[in-house]
């Protein structure tokens, strides 16, 4: 009896061991499953495919794990250097990767090849970021935003689009923001107003602007390419493209400005009870049955009369004119010519209503440069309308960075940070330089050197007399240069 009981106990124990014994199974040798985030059976880790996670045997030292089949070096036969790229990095030749096979981050004896992964289009657009001159040092506030990377708001009926730059994408640009907007022929920018002050310049086509201020003064004007307008905070206004459409750049004096936060007349009507609208406008309730049920922002419109006077409605305060005018026809202002290009200045001196908006529209010929300078009291917000350029920004005490710019890029340089703009292409650079200041001013480094006692300069920088004697006591703004950008590759000569 005892023996039978013992046999039954042993049998039960054997069965229990069989139930709880863990089973280990290896994937079948013929399995062709690929490693990835999920197997062919979804997220089922119990399938016979490779597991989502590896085993503990992969931790730490694994013998014979290296493979000689993947090299981080790009063979010399697979790339070429751009003209001027092999020159001493201290010279900082402004070379281009435009026609270079497989560009590499090499300058003189600095750098090494890059096997990727890479986006070659970025490298070609930014040779001085990819292979910077040796004068670059430390960290500098990010100074570039390509508008081509801004999200584009496109409107129904092919009426237009809008994209913007603000501190969301360029965090250091705290004093100003930009909006690039396009209106199709006869399309409107909806009646609106802003908390920020608005300065605008026409980039393409032509536009009719209309506004009314607190004193009941009205204003209507037609603007062409290069012309400017300004609307103070709170002044309601509208824009209508004329027959060829219009694109314009808007600059606002708030770095965190968003055009999505604009006050719109459609939204204002929607956010008031119809009873209130009826009482305020002394109109029957049914007159408000057709108001839009959503904002319009940009909308197609009826062609405007050719004569702007037909849409000029004098108010109790009359029509704004003279120093109260909201527009300035910069396209008709003669440019100040220099051997290297030209400059037009528009600030409250000649456009009084734009009290703290001072700008320079600068043209730089190939090989020339906007001289090294800084602005003492204002950050500089810039927009490149044409051409290719590079800018080196020096931020005290020891930081410097060189950045490439092309048409459609926005630049931003902090107050007192020195910088220049050098044309690195074969066409003119056209650049808008914007300040928050009552007058457009800058500090010219060359002028400073000339107007400082020579011995102080010689003792400090060890510059020769011939250099100091050749400097002008006047600002040059745009300095002529050699169109052959690689002329100094040998280490001698004048740029």
Regions from the PLM with identified roles:
Residues 1-29:
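Fungal secretory targeting signals
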Residues 26-175, 279-361, 371, 462-495:
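A short, N-terminal "cap"/entry segment at the start of jelly-roll beta-barrel domains
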């Amino acid at each position: 009896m005892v023996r039978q009981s013992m046999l039954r106990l042993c049998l039960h124990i054997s069965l229990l061991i069989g139930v709880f014994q863990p089973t280990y199974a290896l994937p079948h040798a013929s399995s062709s499953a690929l490693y990835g985030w999920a197997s062919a059976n979804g997220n089922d880790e119990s399938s016979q495919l490779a597991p989502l996670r590896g085993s503990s045997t992969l931790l730490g030292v694994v013998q014979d794990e290296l493979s000689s089949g993947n090299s981080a070096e790009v063979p010399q036969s697979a790339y070429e250097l751009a003209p001027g790229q092999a020159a001493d990095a201290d010279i900082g030749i402004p070379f281009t990767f435009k026609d270079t096979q497989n560009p590499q981050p090499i300058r003189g004896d600095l750098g090494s090849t890059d096997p990727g992964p890479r986006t070659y289009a970025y490298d070609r657009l930014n040779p001085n970021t990819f292979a910077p001159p040796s004068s670059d040092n430390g960290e500098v506030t990010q100074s570039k935003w390509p508008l081509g990377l801004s999200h584009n708001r496109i409107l129904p009926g092919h009426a237009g689009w809008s994209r913007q730059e603000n501190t969301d994408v360029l965090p250091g640009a705290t004093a100003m923001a930009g909006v690039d907007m396009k209106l199709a022929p006869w399309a409107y920018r909806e009646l609106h107003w802003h908390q920020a002050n608005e300065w605008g310049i026409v980039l393409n086509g032509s536009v009719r602007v209309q506004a009314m201020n607190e004193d009941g003064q009205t204003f209507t004007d037609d603007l062409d390419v290069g012309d400017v307008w300004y609307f103070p905070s709170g002044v309601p206004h509208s824009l209508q493209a004329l027959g060829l459409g219009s694109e314009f750049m808007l600059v606002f004096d708030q770095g965190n400005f968003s055009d999505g936060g604009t006050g719109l007349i459609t939204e204002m009507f929607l956010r008031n009870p119809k009873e209130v609208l009826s009482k305020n406008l002394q109109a029957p309730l049914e007159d408000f049955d057709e108001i839009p049920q959503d904002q319009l922002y940009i909308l197609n419109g009826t062609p405007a009369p050719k004569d702007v006077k037909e849409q000029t409605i004098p108010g109790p305060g009359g029509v704004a004119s003279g120093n109260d005018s909201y527009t300035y026809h910069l396209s008709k202002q003669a440019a100040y010519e220099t051997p290297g290009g030209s400059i037009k200045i528009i600030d409250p001196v000649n456009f009084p209503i734009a009290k703290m908006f001072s700008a320079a529209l600068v043209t730089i010929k190939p090989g020339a440069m906007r001289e090294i300078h800084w602005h003492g009291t204002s950050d500089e917000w810039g927009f490149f309308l044409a051409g290719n350029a590079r800018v080196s920004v020096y931020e005290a005490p020891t930081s410097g960075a060189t950045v490439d710019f092309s048409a459609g890029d926005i630049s931003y340089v902090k107050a007192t940070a020195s910088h220049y703009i050098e044309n690195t292409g074969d066409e003119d650079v056209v650049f808008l330089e914007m300040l928050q200041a009552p007058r457009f001013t800058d500090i010219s480094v060359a002028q400073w050197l000339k107007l400082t006692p020579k011995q102080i300069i010689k003792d400090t920088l060890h510059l020769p007399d011939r250099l100091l004697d050749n400097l002008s006591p006047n600002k040059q703004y745009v300095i002529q240069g050699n169109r052959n950008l690689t002329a100094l590759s040998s280490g001698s000569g004048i740029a």
